[in-house]
Amino acid sequence: IEQNGTELKVSTEGFWYRTILWEVPIMALICELFYQETNQTRQEDEMVIQTVEDKISKYRNLNIVFAEFGTRRRHSFNVHDLVVRTLKEKGGGSFIGARNVHSAMRYKTRPIGTHAHEWFMFHAAKYGYKMANSVGLEHWTDVYRGDLGIALTDTYTTEVFFEQFDKKFAKLFDGVRHDSGDPLEFGDKTIAHYQKLGIN
């Protein structure tokens, strides 16, 4: 761990399959310590609950189902726990699960996840950037045989991903994951891509 002014650098060494597991707990810890050390006032529980309920209502009105993926950049364990609890209590059919296995177990919801960015980064290092998405998707389906079928789109930009996410992959995978950028713009691009492939 190194700190230079406000810049923090954390490194792990070892085999990839061992070091990758440090990403989530390290990022969650850094976020929680940041908020503690900078004395930033967090929203009261009632405001957190209201924010979550408002989002649930918006998604429900649009017939959108969603999963919770907030562990890495959460304010704190307590706030994150409150969010997942509220989603479970109020989410109904719109809330389909949580990425955090502990939260999923605690609130008896489905543990759900997608590829990590590192999956495609590994394939880029081994096969080259131009092949990273297509080879990564191919290897994923070889291993999981139809399970864990939500594809991550933004490792090397969504545009590049969709160039390689052809009809075969669009039918093999259950869906795609929005991870960065404007969600409405992403939704429009995704719908347009599926329509271009002749998939309704």
Question: What role is predicted for each listed range?
Answer:
Residues 1-197:
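Buried, small/hydrophobic-residue-enriched core segments of structured protein domains
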Residues 200:
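C-terminal active-site-proximal or functional interface alpha/beta core segments in diverse enzymes
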